[in-house]
Amino acid sequence: MVHIMFNQAAQELTTIRDVLRFAVSRFNEAGLFFGHGTDNAHDEAAYLILHTLNLPLDMLAPYLDAKLLEAEKEEVLTVIERRAVEHIPAAYLTHQAWQGEFDFYVDERVIIPRSFIYELLGDGLRPWIEYDELVHNALDLCTGSGCLAIQMAHHYPDAQIDAVDVSLDALEVAGINVEDYGLEERIRLIHTDLFEGLEGTYDLIVSNPPYVDAESVELLPEEYLHEPELALGSGADGLDATRQILLNAAKFLNPKGVLLVEIGHNRDVLEAAYPELPFTWLETSGGDGFVFLLTREQLLGEE
């Protein structure tokens, strides 16, 4: 049911400033969760309004007092109401998600890009990968939208990249993004479950696998219910996929190869399960407990 305030707003709101204020109030009233691109009601509302009106996303102030046409107002308020009532993440409403300077097409076939791994590509992996030109073959496990594979292609200009996912739906979305960036000759999309059926070895393997434990899956905010469950949950402790990666990665790494994996809030659980592995935890904007690095030698117990 459309919220009763929608019709009132359509009649009484005039400017972008009016609609922005209304949207912030509406989002706060609805108790929305923010974390798929913005972290507060104001920024979320501003993004949705600017995107819907085809205005620059970084130029809200000059347009605040601009009056809206009736058709524009209806379109913007419809988006605001869908966000408030259905708890659909903004990225699914706009079909656009950002990571750094890169933007990607997304829909409900893939999770919304939010991995910290992209921050580490290039300079963040020194000294393990001393020069970007040393990466000739790379692998992105659980590629989803293809965002990390595309950013690897940017940071490692000489690399050929395999991007793997068990979901054909996800690979269709990844294909859209790979084509948008003109990387069809450098990124190969592969339908398989982690390493199954892969051949060859890689200088760099990255993965943002499912890592939410069973109990936490049940407690996720409503917004997460719009994301594919396959890409979120990973067994009782959240480590099912990570265990398979740790078990098999060494066989697919070159002698100086590096494994980079994001595991959410599972650092303590992982270290307790693998006390013999010398995990290096890399600093990201989220802290130093989300992404670990292991070399091939460390995985084999040779270092």
UniProtKB/Swiss-Prot annotation:
GO terms for biological process: methylation. Its EC number is 2.1.1.298. It is an enzyme of class 2 (transferase). InterPro entries: DNA_methylase_N6_adenine_CS (IPR002052), HemK-like (IPR004556), Ribosome_uL3_MTase (IPR017127), SAM-dependent_MTases_sf (IPR029063), Small_mtfrase_dom (IPR007848). Keywords: Methyltransferase, S-adenosyl-L-methionine, Transferase. Belongs to the protein N5-glutamine methyltransferase family. PrmB subfamily. NCBIfam families: hemK_fam, L3_gln_methyl. This is Ribosomal protein uL3 glutamine methyltransferase. The gene is prmB.
